[in-house]
């Protein structure tokens, strides 16, 4: 599952304590990271060393995993607010499970590096086709302080194409200071009747700096069927255990189309 890649990115970025906010019928996420002694014994007995190693790596990531529930889907802002006691007054990172990122340096680590220099909240953005801006929160940039780091005039949640302030869309990585929780506590429902994180960040930007980091790596959106299939193929083509067979299959399939 994609949550595996999210946790691995967090670990590679130096994060040790991870809170996963789940919803109804999401127990499979918790089960995924639980140890399974019976399965491991069976794999060992049947000589499936490769699968045994993979199973053990999943459950022994070297990070501390915690879980909390969002009983009702009330928006991303509501989900983030449920992490308030866990964050305990520290800067923190939000990683959305629908977005997988690939780059030489993990995107989360890039945001942490920015924070080390600015000590300010930083949002990951990426240039998208203008016709697609209405799918995202979008920033209005206000000059840059580094090649990939912009000041932000304001944030707009899913603007109409003709009213979008830029083509720089917010993607699923945020580094925020804990002041965001005071804002979320009083945030009124926005688009769709939900508590929008983008609205809260826009409010925070009026009293303290919020920067936007332009991501130049690869982003995979697994939040829809087409994106999930494309991501599976892309990852399959780079994984040593599947790439050769998958390339062969795609070539054979291409000849039939």
Task: Map each language-model feature to its residues.
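Generic secondary-structure signature for well-ordered alpha-helical cores
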Residues: 12, 34, 85-88, 113-120, ...
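Conserved N-terminal catalytic core of the sugar/cofactor nucleotidyltransferase
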Residues: 1-94, 103
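Structural beta-sheet core signal
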Residues: 20, 94, 123-124, 212
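Conserved core of the sugar-phosphate nucleotidyltransferase
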Residues: 101-182, 187, 191
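Alpha-helical scaffold segments in soluble metabolic enzymes
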Residues: 5, 9, 28, 78, ...
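Conserved alpha/beta core of the MobA/IspD/sugar-nucleotide pyrophosphorylase nucleotidyltransferase superfamily
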Residues: 91, 141, 146-151, 165-257
